[in-house]
């Protein structure tokens, strides 16, 4: 799996930049930007690796002696380390603009190895800095740029933005039998739109979204002139795939869910977002259809969904009325899914380190 990186400017971003001479060359000039340490810890927990990259004009010359730089810089690094903040690398350009070197930001000389290794997740890596040159560096690297500012984009805002993404997925599945378009928003509620051509199935899918606490849009064109088999099966496959993609790296999710709702029907549902697809299903129905949905396809739907989502799912229901029995399964699954996808922290809920 490719690695997420944050390439972070030093002066004006990690620590304050003195407006008088733009040099942190005395201990009394060293001051950390508000909230930087707790947010860097949060970002590390979210899977980011940190790289410091900084232009230090004339470092090592008479105007900026190396010893004057080293004292405050080493103290800064000691403080970061003592609090658990670890930088994989510190990259420094010591040249003046007039030197026309190859390593001064926004040129990419200092970060060439990250670009060459192909191990960097470019879509989810960022340059963070307070100057236009930092944003230009991001563009030159082909990654995202965040312009740090104490008022408009400070460290708490950056931490929130990079660890609380909108968990969204869009899946299109086209076969000779069906054309399916599924969108899911795990962190938004309400406004679901579902049209599979099977009215009762639409109602059941809406139960998943409503009780799962998320929004989805599903549009299906299937070979219903034959029967509902391909429509229900392929919808399960596409929805399971969309849920898996929207969950992303699964950091911070509860992972497990269990509900036992009791009404006219007793339904049990247990779920583990384990990466291991498996279904245990027990339900009996009096009739072959409820509305326009074949009751035998209900198990097939959940089996298809659990396969592409990569979950272990146990479902069981008892009751007298077929409509209520079917509905209890979908409601129970929705409530269980709501528990399992809820984000409560930043760690991956697995001792293996992968889900």
Curated annotation (Swiss-Prot):
HAMAP family found in the cross-reference section: Bifunc_HisB, HisB
Pfam families: Hydrolase_like, IGPD
This protein's UniProt keywords: Amino-acid biosynthesis, Cytoplasm, Histidine biosynthesis, Hydrolase, Lyase, Magnesium, Metal-binding, Multifunctional enzyme, Zinc
The protein, known as: Histidine biosynthesis bifunctional protein HisB
Location(s), subcellular: Cytoplasm
UniProt record similarity statement: In the N-terminal section; belongs to the histidinol-phosphatase family. In the C-terminal section; belongs to the imidazoleglycerol-phosphate dehydratase family.
Pathway noted in the entry: Amino-acid biosynthesis; L-histidine biosynthesis; L-histidine from 5-phospho-alpha-D-ribose 1-diphosphate: step 6/9; Amino-acid biosynthesis; L-histidine biosynthesis; L-histidine from 5-phospho-alpha-D-ribose 1-diphosphate: step 8/9
GO CC aspect terms: cytoplasm
Binding site for Mg(2+): 9, 11, 130
PANTHER family according to UniProt: IMIDAZOLEGLYCEROL-PHOSPHATE DEHYDRATASE (PTHR23133:SF2), IMIDAZOLEGLYCEROL-PHOSPHATE DEHYDRATASE HIS7 (PTHR23133)
Active site location: 9, 11
Residues bound to Zn(2+): 93, 95, 101, 103
Catalytic reactions of this protein: D-erythro-1-(imidazol-4-yl)glycerol 3-phosphate = 3-(imidazol-4-yl)-2-oxopropyl phosphate + H2O; L-histidinol phosphate + H2O = L-histidinol + phosphate
Region entry Histidinol-phosphatase, spans: 1-166
GO biological process, one term: L-histidine biosynthetic process
The keyword Amino-acid biosynthesis belongs to this UniProt entry's keyword annotation: yes
Region annotation (Imidazoleglycerol-phosphate dehydratase) ranges: 167-355
């Amino acid at each position: 799996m490719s690695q997420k990186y944050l390439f972070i400017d030093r002066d004006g971003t990690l620590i304050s930049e003195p407006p008088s001479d733009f040099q942190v060359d005395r201990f009394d000039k060293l001051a950390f930007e508000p909230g930087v340490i707790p947010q860097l810890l949060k970002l590390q927990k979210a899977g980011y690796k940190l790289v410091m990259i900084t232009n230090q004009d004339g470092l090592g010359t008479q105007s900026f002696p190396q010893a004057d730089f080293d004292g405050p810089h080493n103290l800064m690094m000691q403080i970061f380390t003592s609090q658990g903040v670890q930088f994989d690398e510190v990259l420094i350009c010591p040249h003046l603009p007039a030197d026309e070197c190859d390593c001064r930001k926004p040129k990419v000389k200092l970060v060439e190895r990250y670009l060459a290794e192909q191990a960097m997740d470019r879509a989810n890596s960022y340059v963070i800095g307070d100057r236009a040159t930092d944003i230009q560096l991001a563009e030159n690297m082909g990654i995202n740029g965040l312009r740090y500012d104490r008022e408009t984009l400070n460290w708490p805002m950056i931490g929130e933005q990079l660890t609380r993404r909108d968990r969204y997925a869009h899946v299109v599945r086209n076969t000779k039998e069906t054309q399916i378009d599924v969108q899911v928003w795990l962190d938004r509620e309400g406004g679901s739109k579902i049209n599979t051509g099977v009215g009762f199935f639409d109602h059941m899918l809406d139960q998943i979204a409503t009780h799962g606490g998320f929004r989805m849009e599903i549009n299906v064109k299937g070979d219903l002139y034959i029967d509902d088999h391909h429509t229900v099966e392929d919808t399960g496959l596409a929805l399971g795939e969309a849920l898996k993609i929207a969950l992303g790296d699964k950091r911070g999710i509860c992972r497990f869910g269990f509900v036992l709702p009791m009404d006219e029907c007793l339904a049990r549902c247990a779920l583990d977002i384990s990466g291991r697809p498996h279904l245990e299903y027990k339900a009996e129905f009096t009739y072959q259809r409820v509305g326009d949905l074949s009751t035998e396809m209900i198990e097939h739907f959940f089996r298809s969904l659990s396969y592409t989502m990569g979950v272990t799912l146990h479902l069981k229901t008892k009751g007298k009325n077929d409509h209520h029995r079917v509905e209890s399964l979908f409601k129970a699954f929705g409530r269980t899914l709501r528990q399992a996808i809820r984000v409560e922290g930043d760690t991956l809920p697995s001792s293996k380190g992968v889900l």
